[in-house]
Amino acid sequence: MSQQVIIFDTTLRDGEQALQASLSVKEKLQIALALERMGVDVMEVGFPVSSPGDFESVQTIARQVKNSRVCALARCVEKDIDVAAESLKVAEAFRIHTFIATSPMHIATKLRSTLDEVIERAIYMVKRARNYTDDVEFSCEDAGRTPIADLARVVEAAINAGATTINIPDTVGYTMPFEFAGIISGLYERVPNIDKAIISVHTHDDLGLAVGNSLAAVHAGARQVEGAMNGIGERAGNCSLEEVIMAIKVRKDILNVHTAINHQEIWRTSQLVSQICNMPIPANKAIVGSGAFAHSSGIHQDGVLKNRENYEIMTPESIGLNQIQLNLTSRSGRAAVKHRMDEMGYKESEYNLDNLYDAFLKLADKKGQVFDYDLEALAFIGKQQEEPEHFRLDYFSVQSGSNDIATAAVKLACGEEVKAEAANGNGPVDAVYQAINRITDYNVELVKYSLTAKGHGKDALGQVDIVTNYNGRRFHGVGLATDIVESSAKAMVHVLNNIWRAAEVEKELQRKTQHNENNKETV
């Protein structure tokens, strides 16, 4: 009988560590709701003790996610576990995930401790976590380089202390698949109480073996796989969840396991994570790359036309990729736009129809036909920028040529006031940015600039993603338009609004702190 493999997503915790700019609470919630819709069993959404922002993110997601178990990370430290529990207590169901290093190298050089002390600490902290929840996961950091006898001792002790899931990470992506399978098999042979916990694996891709190691572990008896959408994560990344999920589905004949994932949501979730995290998906990426279902060889094309199974082991439709793209025009009404969004699987709560339709009409007037990928791009950008704006791009004009210095004139609405400036720059985009900086007097440093075509051909939309540095903090902005300079300007305005909102939040926190201090003095 087929057994279920629990899918544990860590996109918002381990995955986010790879990003150049931290995600906002709103962006994290968007991803969390998409993961819930996809059907992940557990989502690890942050490290609450690390910052007030992470605490708020975990708490917000814990409050809103209902159908997936929400998890937070904690070191084997009392405060970590207490803060994690505090952030999670609003959840329908939650898990505390605590960890400590177990390899001789980590114990000696990082912890400056002994294996016996590590075991004692693990027991104490697992018991502390069990005071808050019956669902406690314990991880043996660097398990891949831990002698099996030592690892078995730690695992047995953690289970006796109350851990319900034991995670075996290949923290540095060092282990070969046959070795990793041997570790899992070895634990089943050596740990007498192993039947009282789920064995989980968490692999990294430093040698390109994360997915292979996870599948080898599943074949050896692991029943939870941890990973991130699109494989994002530190260094070379985490195990790509979409790859493991589809491998389990396609090769159920030899693995004899299944997941509870809604496979039709894989494509959408992957695209959303890519866009929000500003991490483009390589064309040759398995499962979700733009070339994953493309056939250029004449022999292959002929074979696919005769029978898709000749060269396709899965279909685009099996991951929710609809290859039939319909187009709308400026004559299409609101009902037609809503109907198409419904057909693509979007709920009304995921976008603002009024804003989407306004943006759709402007785009349709410019390019004539609007395709599915255009609508999705407009909906995504609208969601990112739907919060109140202090800055708004009112007008811009650029002049440049092969022998001319680029000049830009920009008019920007700043609250109730409209300001205008002109500036020169190293190209039209830089000129626009210089003019915007003059208007706002923000000393914004551009760290990263990327341009992605959304759609096909000469009428494709250009999405600009930028990462900026302002007062020691990283801010991400995104802009979308048929004109690249306009996209770039909108991305910078998005950054400015994010900076302004962050400053307003800081002012409010200071006001509350001062209010509390005044109350103490009164008492």
Curated annotation (Swiss-Prot):
Source taxon at top rank: Bacteria
GO biological process, one term: L-leucine biosynthetic process
Source taxonomy: Bacteria, Pseudomonadati, Pseudomonadota, Gammaproteobacteria, Enterobacterales
Cofactor: Mn(2+)
Native source species: Shigella flexneri
Role description: Catalyzes the condensation of the acetyl group of acetyl-CoA with 3-methyl-2-oxobutanoate (2-ketoisovalerate) to form 3-carboxy-3-hydroxy-4-methylpentanoate (2-isopropylmalate).
EC number(s) on file: 2.3.3.13
Molecular function terms, GO-annotated: 2-isopropylmalate synthase activity; acetyl-CoA C-acetyltransferase activity; manganese ion binding
Protein name: 2-isopropylmalate synthase
PROSITE patterns named in the record: AIPM_HOMOCIT_SYNTH_1, AIPM_HOMOCIT_SYNTH_2, PYR_CT
Family: Belongs to the alpha-IPM synthase/homocitrate synthase family. LeuA type 1 subfamily.
